[in-house]
A protein has these predicted regions:
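Active-site-adjacent "lid/gating" segments in soluble enzymes
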Residues: 3-145, 149-150
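Alpha-helical scaffold segments in soluble metabolic enzymes
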Residues: 76-83, 111, 157-161, 189, ...
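Short, surface-exposed loop/helix-turn segments at secondary-structure junctions
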Residues: 115-122, 225-239
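Aromatic-enriched alpha-helical interface/lid elements that frame and gate functional surfaces
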Residues: 133-209, 213
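Flexible, small-/acidic-enriched active-site or ligand-binding loops
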Residues: 237-293
């Protein structure tokens, strides 16, 4: 680790007690966890996430992105900002530690809490929700539409749009717990109606009725929809022909918006500068500005 270079927290803090020092590991800094390599996929497996992802009778699946790498980075950022805020009060820095496994268990939210608080070990349910229905993708004439009627009011609006308003007063489906218990009876009744029209037609009508829903997009469809609703998801960094399209920072600031100035460097763009800097003899009296020059 960094101790080989004299850069572990204790050494750095001895020279600068106000330093805020962040560390991210796979399984913590304890003697048992520190020796384990931390890769996102391994943590998806060992945290239990993969046991929750996939069809009930199928194999466990990983998430489509390195979700816990991202989450741990966000947790570290929150920790650093909290430590900086504390330093304004007490003048002291501190060591902020984050590990992938703890971030993962936190990110499992209701699933990990169900086990910790009640001993309930959750299981895979495909795209179904354990305690809500309809709350999953349902097939239309040309593809699937996610419908999340999370309460009885929304369910009533949904079946009215679908042309089967009598289902809202059917004793099997009146309450959410009834709909969940009888989902295998309710699903084909909804699907029979949904299959009569394309998903985007249903999307427009169901949304207009106040029921949350959405089509399952590919990534290009996700970007296109963000553009359609005015989120401006793509920003061009740089100028002219060297400008590089990138995904926009998701955080909007009313007073201090991000400044997208420098595009990613081209291959070896700064190579000569770096090689010259590495070859130069170190001057302990040089300022940071002189060293960077």
């Amino acid at each position: 680790g960094l101790a080989r270079f004299g850069l572990e927290y204790e050494t750095v803090a001895a020279g600068n007690p106000g330093v805020v020092y962040a560390s991210i590991s796979g399984f913590g800094s304890g003697p048992k966890g520190a020796v384990l390599p931390g890769y996102d996929l391994i943590v998806q497996a060992m945290s239990g996430l993969m046991s929750l992802t996939g069809e009930r009778d199928g194999e466990p699946y990983r998430a489509g992105i390195s979700v816990f790498d991202v989450m741990a980075g966000l947790h570290a950022t929150i920790g650093v900002l909290s430590a900086l805020n504390a330093r304004h009060t007490n003048g002291r820095g501190q060591h902020v530690e984050v590990n992938l496994l703890s971030s993962a268990l936190s990110g499992l939210v209701n699933q990990s809490s169900a086990y910790v608080a009640g001993g309930v070990v959750p299981f895979r349910m495909g795209n179904s929700h354990p305690s809500l229905f309809p709350y999953e993708p349902l097939p239309c004439a040309d593809g699937e539409l996610i419908i999340t009627a999370g309460n009885s009011g929304q369910f009533r609006k949904l079946v009215e749009v679908l042309g089967v308003p009598e289902l809202a007063d059917d004793p099997r489906f009146v309450r959410n717990e009834d709909r969940t218990a009888n989902r295998e009876e309710l699903r084909p009744l909804l699907v029979d109606r949904l299959r009569t029209r394309p998903k985007m037609e249903w999307f427009r009508d169901i949304i207009a009725a106040g029921v949350p829903c959405g089509p399952i997009n590919t990534v290009d469809g996700g970007v296109a929809f963000a553009e359609e609703v005015g989120l401006e998801p793509v920003v061009h960094v740089g100028e002219g022909t060297s400008a590089v399209p990138s995904v926009r920072n998701p955080i909007r600031f009313s007073e201090t918006p991000p400044d997208y100035r420098l595009p990613p460097p081209s291959l070896d763009e700064h190579g000569e500068d770096i090689r010259r800097w590495l070859a130069a003899p170190a001057d302990p009296q040089a300022t940071d500005e002189e060293r960077s020059a």
